[in-house]
């Protein structure tokens, strides 16, 4: 049974001091690594701390592949609308779509954005570091998506959208179930397609050379001067959660520095295609992806902390909005959100084997790609952006890199992103 608590009916204002204090006070739950109960969820302050428009409501959906899923929802008032499904990345939340949802709803769509498994107010997943990886592998995350669509009474989705870590979930959903997910917008993280099984080897074809693993890349990065390391390897470690949750600069300032570092406002972001996945080439990438070996992620974000005048005048991410992320992650910690790094195909043989089941398949529904021109996520894995456009997506109709945006493109340039989505939906979004 789906239950809701509409935001429009909430009228509570939070000061920054309240937000920060609340985050600190609630962080004990994360420390205990204890699963939040549904009763505890419904007693929490309203989602978004008053920073979300009245046309968006917050709602809990039970019995979704073992989860109680928290969603933001817009355009729900009118029955029979086509569904648009938005998947966030890391370290984000359903909240990251707050600027996009009202525009799509005003155009006549029913728009949903869940807190993904491991994030925010969605519960039912194991919050411990030792959690069974199966619950966070891509096929189970795809089942989460299908289960939510069905729970809402739909058989198809006009457009699924995935940003950052949400991009592979959206991509695999569209590849595996094109009957449900009728078109896709991939954002910031290009889709490489399924890993290939060896072909024609019985007739003399050579086995393909295996790609360099993250561990092999890390070993080469460590030889550089100064030594470096790949961020995904760091994020798989047990200490990654505490590093960010208890950042010396405070959780609020961690988010401010991290979001700024990967945005177009940080002038050191000048992404371009790399020749190969070698240490020398990868060393061109900023420290948030190819970190200094002796620095944590919290220290990496601290090195990019913007000045006070920038913070006071930042329109795309206000202090109150940063406070929403700090409050939610202060309550949950990062462990669940980090589990995806541990079961990505490059580091997890079980995931690799599962994905090879789909060797030779492509996304065959209409697709487009959107990213900021200042987003290194497009090129951090050499060759993938090109492969997405030639083989991984058979109906790629647009590859868009937007001025004035870095990694957080839907928050930095929501008007441009919404315009591209609506144009795409008008042409291809027939559920």
Language-model features, listed with the residues they occupy:
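Flexible "cap/lid" subdomain of the alpha/beta-hydrolase fold that forms the substrate-access gate
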Residues: 39-58, 69, 77-78, 83, ...
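Catalytic active-site module of serine/aspartate enzymes centered on a nucleophile-bearing elbow/loop
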Residues: 396-431
């Amino acid at each position: 049974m789906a239950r809701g608590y509409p935001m429009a009916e909430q009228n509570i204002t939070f000061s920054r001091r309240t937000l920060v204090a609340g985050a600190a006070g609630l962080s004990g739950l994360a420390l205990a690594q204890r699963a939040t109960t549904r009763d505890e969820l419904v007693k929490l302050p309203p989602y978004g701390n008053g920073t979300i428009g009245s046309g968006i409501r917050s709602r809990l959906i039970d019995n979704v592949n073992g989860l109680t899923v928290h969603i933001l929802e817009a355009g729900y008032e009118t029955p029979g609308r086509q569904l648009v499904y938005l998947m966030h990345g890391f370290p984000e939340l359903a909240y990251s779509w707050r600027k996009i949802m009202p525009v799509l709803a005003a155009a006549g769509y029913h728009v949903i954005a869940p807190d993904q498994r491991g994030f925010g107010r969605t519960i039912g997943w194991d919050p411990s570091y030792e959690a069974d990886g199966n619950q966070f592998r891509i096929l189970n995350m795809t089942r989460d998506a299908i289960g939510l669509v069905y729970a809402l009474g739909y058989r198809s989705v006009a457009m699924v959208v995935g940003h950052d870590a949400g991009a592979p979930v959206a991509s695999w959903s569209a590849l595996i179930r094109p009957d449900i997910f009728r078109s896709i917008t991939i954002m910031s993280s290009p889709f490489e397609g399924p890993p290939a099984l060896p072909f024609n080897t019985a007739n003399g074809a050579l086995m393909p050379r295996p790609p360099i693993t993250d561990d092999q890349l890390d070993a080469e990065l460590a030889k550089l001067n100064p030594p470096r390391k790949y961020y995904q390897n760091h994020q798989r470690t047990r200490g990654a959660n505490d590093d960010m949750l208890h950042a010396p600069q405070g959780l609020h300032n961690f988010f401010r520095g991290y979001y700024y570092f990967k945005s177009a406002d940080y002038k050191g972001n000048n992404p371009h295609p790399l020749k190969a996945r070698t240490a020398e080439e990868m060393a061109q990438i900023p420290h948030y992806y190819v970190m200094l070996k002796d620095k944590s992620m919290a220290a990496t974000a601290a090195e990019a902390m913007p000045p006070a005048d920038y913070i006071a005048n930042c329109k795309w991410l206000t202090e109150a909005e940063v406070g929403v992320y700090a409050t939610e992650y202060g309550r949950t910690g990062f462990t669940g959100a980090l589990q995806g790094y541990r079961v990505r195909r490059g580091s997890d043989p079980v995931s690799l084997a599962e994905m090879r089941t789909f060797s030779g398949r492509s996304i065959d529904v209409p697709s487009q790609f959107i990213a900021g021109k200042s987003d290194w996520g497009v090129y951090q894995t050499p060759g993938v952006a090109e492969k997405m456009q030639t083989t991984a997506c058979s109906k790629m109709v647009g590859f868009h890199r937007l001025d004035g945006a870095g990694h957080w493109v839907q928050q930095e340039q929501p008007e441009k992103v919404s315009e591209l989505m609506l144009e795409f939906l008008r042409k291809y979004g027939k559920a």
